[in-house]
Structures are given as C-alpha cells and as structure tokens.
C-alpha cells in the first residue's frame, strides 16, 4: 500500500512537528505556509541590526529529564545552539528602590523573602517547599500527557489540585507585608488570574537550570526544526495561504489556496489559527457547542498583546533579564491606566545586538478593537504606535540612565500585526482559558483536535489543544502522528 499523503496547513511548531514525525513514520507530507518563513508566532526579525524576538520567554526542555527535552532532541530543535539558564525569574521594583528578586536558587529565594518579611515566614516556606517538591516531577507532561504521565504525578496530585485552584494574586494576599503582597502577585509575567501552581512549576524547573533560553531565540529554534523536516524529505510551500479546506461527502480531501490552486491528500491537518480553520476555511460547517462557546468567550484584552521593542546603543551589564517596574504615577495605554511595566532585557544573548548594544522589550495587555479601529487610518495607526513607544521610553529613562538617547531602533507589535502574520483570531498569540462550563472537556479533549462529522481531518498546535506553550504545540504534532500510526497499525518511530 502506498504511503498516505498529508497536507499540513501552517509551518508553526505544531505543523513542523507533525511534518517531522509524519516523515519519520512513512507518511508523505507537505506544508503550506502563508508567510515567507516558518515558525508561526515562534518568530524573530531584524531592525537596523537588532534582533527582536516575539515568542520565547522561558523554554522548558533545555536540560535532560523532561518530555520537552526529549521532543526537542528528536526534532533537532536545539542542535548547535547554546542555552542559557537564568539566575532569577524576575525582579520586581518600586520607584523608591524596594526590590523583590525571585532567585531561581530556592535557598537564596527563601532567605531573601524571609529578610523582606520575617513575619510571613510560614507562607514563604509553604511556597518554597512546594517548588522544591515539584522539582522531581514533569508536571506539564503529567497535565497534558497520557495516563502513564498522569499516574507518575500521584505523589504530588493533592498539591497540584490545591495550588491549581488558588490564583497567584490570592496566594499573595496571605502575606502581611504590603510590598511582598503586591510584588508577588506579578511574578508570572505580570499576568492576572494565573494559578499559583504555574510559578511553582516554573521555579521548580528553573532551580534545576531548565526553563531558560536558546541562544538565537525563536527563529533559531524554528529554523532548526524546519531544517530537520526538510532533511527528512518534507516539503514546505511558503507564501501559500490556504483559503479553503476542500470537503467531499464529509471527508477532507484537500485545500484551495489564495491563488485558486487546489491540492489534494489523504489526510488534512491544520496547524493554523483555530478560529480561521473552523469558521473560515471550513465555513463553520463542522462545529460543536463547546467550540462556539470557547470562541465566543474571548477576553476583551489579551496578555502579550502589545510588544514594544527598543534597540539600544547601551550595555545593561548586571541588569536582571526580566523586571516588573512599579511606576510613581500610572501610565495610560489604550485608555487604560497601568501602575507598572513588564520589561525584558536581552543582555544575555549577544546574537541580538552588536558589541555594547542591547535589546529591551516591554509587554503590555492590549485590546484588538482599539488597534483595529486605528488601522483604518494607516497614518494615525503609525502615529499612535510612535506615541506609545515614546511614552514608554520616557518611563524607562527614569530607571535606565540615558535610555532615550541611546535608542537606535524601535518596533511596536499590536494585535493587528499578529493578524497580519498568522491570521490569529483577533490578534491572540496564544489561547485563553476555557470558560468554566467547558473547562473539563477542553482539559480532557482540547478545543478542536477533531471536528464532529468531518473525517480525515485533524488539528494540532496551541489552538487545537487549548493550552499555550511552544512545547505544547510540538507535542500536539507528535501525538497526532502517534495516533495515526496506531490507526494504521504501524509502530510509531521517533527516528528514521
């Protein structure tokens, strides 16, 4: 029997992963990608000699012993790349000079927190004890993997359940020290509503040198996986936007591109945006209530929605790689007031800037409608981006002497930019938490790994799974091919 053919829509990490494992296991795959490069949202680009990186913050799997390490090894994702382990997760500062340094050395963190607030020793010790306990477990694999991975979590299951139900903000309210209370609430990328389990998982990993950085960033990671895919005999057609998934008798049979050309295969896999796949490419013909409920529940503002980049002719030696800077007075962005800024300093990756230079990024929540309305007038849209970059630079100049005068390159990424790059629904770069009424189903089955009534069709990536992360996307591609091998009575292989 001839090898089954698979068309994959999108060369993000989910699509590339599905392509690699498909090729290894005897499927004939081809990827259609709308952009001139692979990676999807795992991307970086150059401005005036500086590299601006969109995706990677903390990459799990840079040290042995986790499922992410194994998948990056299988995909060649880190081949030839140096990796960097962070000494701190984040440093939170006030204008008065108070600092909460989230050291990745747990002993050092515990001592630092107890010095900040001796009266909070009990709650501090509880947090650090949980981080230490989770060190011996691959928690993300347990939460997203099969029954075997879940069973391995049994010794810590009670703690996992407990801390998954407490937000970081609510945990912080238990501290009596006002500064520690407000600082602790911001440690997970300054996101709101995040279970305290998540920073515990991050700290457990970082204390072992994991959840670090691949030197070269997002594009280096994606480029390595693309190289593996091509070396395995795969094919990528760039600048090839899929407009429609072709269906005959409720079976997916091919795709139609923007130029009108049609391409056919035995199986169709979408690694593209979930909404665009279900409601545009398939015209909403194969939808269940939980999918509609999920996409109707989108938040009005999105994390990582605005990213402001600066290329600076200035060194930032000794500065933390991540900072939350509380402001002496609120800053107004998109008609909303913020009392702090989330800042990333790329002084640990020399490939991002020349000698004596550094890239700095500021991340802010954003509303798609605000920028979509502005984009109707291109001049006004660009003026507002410049005003925003200037406004934020003024604030950073107070923290970093000479910041404004050393700026050589600027870029501002809005939700409209993300729609242009990836077709992401309303500019979201990652999925949002499922509403309560479908959270159990999404946790168990994902949002849309398959669609009701449609055969020979599958989805991979963050949107299919309903959970964010580069590792999540890569695992979804692997898991799909493993399932296809089972369906076809093949032994699943991870190498040729």
Model-derived features: positions:
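N-terminal glycine-rich phosphate/pyrophosphate-binding loop and immediately adjacent elements
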Residues: 2-133
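C-terminal segments that line or cap access tunnels to active or ligand-binding sites in enzymes
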Residues: 313-416, 420
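A glycine-rich dinucleotide-binding beta-alpha-beta segment and adjacent secondary-structure elements
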Residues: 178-191, 402-466
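A conserved FAD-binding loop/helix module that cradles the flavin
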Residues: 56, 462-484
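Mid-domain catalytic core of redox enzymes
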Residues: 213, 243-355
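Rossmann-like flavin
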Residues: 95-197
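Active-site-proximal substrate-binding core of FAD-dependent oxidoreductases
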Residues: 247, 486-496
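Helical element adjacent to the flavin cofactor pocket in flavoenzyme catalytic cores
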Residues: 204-252
């Amino acid at each position: 029997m001839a090898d089954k053919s698979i068309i994959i829509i999108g060369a993000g990490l989910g699509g590339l992963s599905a392509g690699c494992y498909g090729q290894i296991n005897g499927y004939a795959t081809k990827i259609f990608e709308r952009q001139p490069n692979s990676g999807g949202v795992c991307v970086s680009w150059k401005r005036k000699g500086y590299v601006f990186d969109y995706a990677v913050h903390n990459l799990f799997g840079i040290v042995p012993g986790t499922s992410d390490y194994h998948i990056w090894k299988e995909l060649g994702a880190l081949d030839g790349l140096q990796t960097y382990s962070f000494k701190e997760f984040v440093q939170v500062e006030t204008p008065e000079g108070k600092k909460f340094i989230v050291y990745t050395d747990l002993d050092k963190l515990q001592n630092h927190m107890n010095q900040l607030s001796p009266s909070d020793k009990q709650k501090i010790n509880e947090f650090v004890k949980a981080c230490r306990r989770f060190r011996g477990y691959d928690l993300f694999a347990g939460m997203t993997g099969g029954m075997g991975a879940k069973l391995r979590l049994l010794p810590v299951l009670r703690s996992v359940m407990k801390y998954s139900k407490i937000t970081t903000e609510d945990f912080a309210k238990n501290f009596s020290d006002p500064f520690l209370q407000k600082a602790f609430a911001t440690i997970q990328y300054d996101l709101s509503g995040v279970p305290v389990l998540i920073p515990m998982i991050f700290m457990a990993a970082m204390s072992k040198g994991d959840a670090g950085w691949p030197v070269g960033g997002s594009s280096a990671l994606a480029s390595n996986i693309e190289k593996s895919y091509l070396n395995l005999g795969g094919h990528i057609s760039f600048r090839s936007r899929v407009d429609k998934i072709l269906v005959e008798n409720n079976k997916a049979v091919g795709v139609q591109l923007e130029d009108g050309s049609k391409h056919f295969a035995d199986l169709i896999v979408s690694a593209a945006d979930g909404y665009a796949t279900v409601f545009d490419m398939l015209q909403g013909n194969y939808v269940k209530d939980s999918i509609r409920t999920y996409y109707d529940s989108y938040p009005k503002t999105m994390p990582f929605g605005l990213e402001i980049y600066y290329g600076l002719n200035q060194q930032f030696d000794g500065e933390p790689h991540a900072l939350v800077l509380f402001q002496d007075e609120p800053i107004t962005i998109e008609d909303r007031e913020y009392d702090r800024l989330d800042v990333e300093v790329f002084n640990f990756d020399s490939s991002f800037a020349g000698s004596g230079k550094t890239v700095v990024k500021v991340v802010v929540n954003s509303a798609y409608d605000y920028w979509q309305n502005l984009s109707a007038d291109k001049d006004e849209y660009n003026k507002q981006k410049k005003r925003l970059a200037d406004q934020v630079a003024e604030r950073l100049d107070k923290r970093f002497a000479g910041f404004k005068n050393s700026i050589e390159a600027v870029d501002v990424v809005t939700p409209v930019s993300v729609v242009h790059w990836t077709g992401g629904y309303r500019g979201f770069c990652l999925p949002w938490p499922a509403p309560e009424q479908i959270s159990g189903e999404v946790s168990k089955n994902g949002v849309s790994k398959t669609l009701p009534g449609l055969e020979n069709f599958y989805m991979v990536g963050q949107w299919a799974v309903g959970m964010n992360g580069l590792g999540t996307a890569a695992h979804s591609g692997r898991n799909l091919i493993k399932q296809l091998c089972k369906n076809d009575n093949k032994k699943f292989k991870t190498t040729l």
